[in-house]
Amino acid sequence: MRYNAVDDPLCYPDTHVLRNEADIADQAELDEFEQLMFDSRAEEELPGGNLDFMHFCALHHHFFQDIYEWAGQPRTVRTGKGDNWFCYPEYIGSEATKLFTELANRNFFADAKDEAEFAQDAAWFLSELNAIHTFREGNGRIQLVFLTLLTRHAGFKFDEDQLRPEEFLKAMIVSFDGELGALADEIKRVI
């Protein structure tokens, strides 16, 4: 499902295709280019950081710098998917600061007694982060990268082979309405 956006200057005229560094105006071609560039950057060392909002933005920049000139920068347009609208851009900074402060106050979930507790905490965090939807594109992928870092920081192993993308996406969608059980289950599956 494509995004809904209000007056999006980042798109080519009369399309929903985001302007990009390769000047690709076809969505299917852009999707392929995005994946190729993302996979290429995944082979490189990730930017270091403190698991804070700046680190989250640096990760987005790392993976999307070859695709979008605004990589790593919070979005400036209102956007949503389906009937759900994400955090308005004028509140992204303050909401993200609150969320990442809470994450730090909770010691990045490193005190979780087991995988189930970590998964529940991480599900809450990801659902909130997804509702903020910091970037115009690439949120889900960067959220997974960040989840990998959180998992490792908490002393658990992230097993990408256990990830079920379709089920994870469905769980993210229902988490928007506060239902965290499915997302916690999917997270527990990968750790």
Predicted feature descriptions by range:
Residues M1-I191:
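FIC/Doc superfamily catalytic core
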